[in-house]
A protein has these predicted regions:
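Juxtamembrane helix-loop transition sites at the ends of transmembrane segments
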Residues: 41, 47, 59, 196, ...
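Helix-coil boundary and N-terminal low-complexity module in membrane systems
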Residues: 1-147, 151, 204-209, 213-216, ...
């Protein structure tokens, strides 16, 4: 039996083991498609936001204060970067949800040698995405409700003197747990495991789960790396499922 420290270390390592799997044939398209959609979405939002911001400056700043634009545009650029940094992974989870189950399936096929019953070619790829769309959205809504039912009470603890000093640490632990649930849902859901059963499995290897979730949380805070956190975490969670949970 592994020590808690070894479990944490092993769990964190599974995130990084997902990264080299992303470039394999048959897996790559499930990474590129949602990343491209998410990038185009944010690019469009920033473009239209810049147009509206420029129009706002035209209406508010008189000609003799035109030099203020040189101060305000860098502020807009910095705020845009903050929005992308903090929201990219969150929005990306919603955009990538229909792709992630198929990504987990493709990664598991790569690891086990058992081919999934998915269609080949781009037409089949589009059909698979369409079929998985509704179940993926329902799964995300279920996880969001689970998150809110626990996040709100934790947030309310901030109002309690004395206890509020431990809330940041509690929030970090809860975030790591939620990320383990978020990404383990894809390989486990592919096997037909219910949400309560998924949580039971993860809770049975709690330190392993926390190690994985903590590394995902850390990676989301690194600019650049956070763009690939979602597919890497899905692939890593699938490796963790195959090696640690599938035998149970």
């Amino acid at each position: 039996m592994k020590s808690p420290f070894n479990e944490l270390s092993t769990g964190s390592g599974y995130f990084w083991r997902g990264f080299p799997l992303l470039n394999h044939p048959g897996i790559r398209r499930y990474v590129i498609a949602p990343l491209l959609i998410n990038t185009l979405l944010f690019a469009a939002l920033i473009y239209f936001g810049a147009e509206k911001f420029d129009a706002l400056l035209d209406s508010l700043i008189p000609a003799w204060l035109d030099w203020l634009r040189w101060l305000l545009w860098p502020i807009f650029a910095i705020l845009s970067l903050f929005v992308v940094f903090f929201l990219f992974s969150w929005v990306g989870n919603l955009v990538a949800a229909p792709f992630n189950s198929l990504l987990a399936e493709a990664v598991q096929a790569r690891l086990t040698g058992v081919s999934p019953d998915t269609n080949t070619g781009w037409l089949g790829f589009a059909r698979d995405i369409a079929v998985s769309f509704l179940p993926a959205v329902l799964s995300e809504l279920r996880k969001i409700s689970y998150f809110l039912l626990r996040a709100i009470p934790i947030g309310l603890l901030l109002l309690v003197p004395g206890i509020n000093i431990v809330v940041p640490f509690l929030w970090l632990a809860f975030s790591a747990w939620m990320l383990a649930i978020e990404y383990s849902d894809y390989p486990m859901g592919n096997q037909g495991l219910s949400f309560p059963e998924q949580r039971r499995r993860l809770n049975g290897r709690r330190m392993l789960s926390f190690g994985f979730g903590a590394m995902v949380l850390l990676a989301t805070m690194v600019p650049g790396l956070n763009l690939l956190v979602i597919p890497t975490a899905v692939a890593g969670a699938t490796v963790m499922w195959v090696e640690e949970h599938d035998r149970k």
